[in-house]
């Protein structure tokens, strides 16, 4: 018997990260020493005080029970404190914050409560693949906004006609950006908020890489006056505190949207693990030196990869934040061809830019989540392919 699956199940695109994991595993099974720069899986370890809080929390009998649906008050208060001391934003923990199991959990809920079949969702291209996948599963119409290198890999919001904005139900922003590492200046966010108010759409800002900038930290969307009238922000603890495997984050901002996400999540999600919330509260409310140290470490790694590739002849975007390097393939190649060559001939795995939309088709994304020694080795291996570069750039 063949079981007929739902339209939703039939519409799910392949996961590009899972596919690359299989490709890397197959290469390693053949004996290749692969330096995997394809995935944003942090190689750090939560600092000692966060681990100590988690260990102590495991031994608390109260933490063997279900937690409050919205999140433990301690965690939500710590999230509010983080917004206050890091961004100067005052939030009500009871109505403007909600605990989630990482950014994708919050994104899925936000997409679900905002989009009906046929609704239009806009996002910059290149984009994090889940935006496309979630839109497709919900039957929404996608409006990619091409980001431009000359604009610092930001889209030109004013290039979109007013009648097109009138059709948009949701605008998704993501800065520091995955995959490009671009950051958005305050005036960009302010313009997005102005357009949302004028044309009646909501904004979701995916703030997964908060705190991880090269120089000046990316500002929160919620620092913009009136931003809370039109949108929410989704923050993850995965990258800031090297807690990717622990799964925690929060939704913040507009009370109506936060309430809708809560109601959806009550039925379709799960509470964040109790002791993870306790550890997360310690991370958020305490000193942020660990985050600054991580940002400095990633900046040093970024310099290794970016400068090494430039020395070989590649055009590399001067990314301002996040965990990735965004490099252009030579003129005669696509990003897919370049990534295949790097893996096949140098044992270096990177993701083709086409995984992130059409605009990135001639680019590759390299993650910085390997020790510096391995990054130096990756650049050296790629450099050995350089005799062909003059021909490829012709």
Feature annotation, model-predicted:
Residues 228-299, 303, 307, 386, ...:
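Conserved core segment of the aminotransferase class I/II
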Residues 281, 296-306, 316-328, 360:
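Conserved glycine-rich beta-strand-loop-beta hairpin in the small C-terminal domain of fold type I
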Residues 59, 63-194, 211-212, 218-224, ...:
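Conserved core of the PLP fold type I
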Residues 81, 332, 341-351, 356-394:
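PLP-dependent enzyme catalytic core of the Aspartate aminotransferase-like
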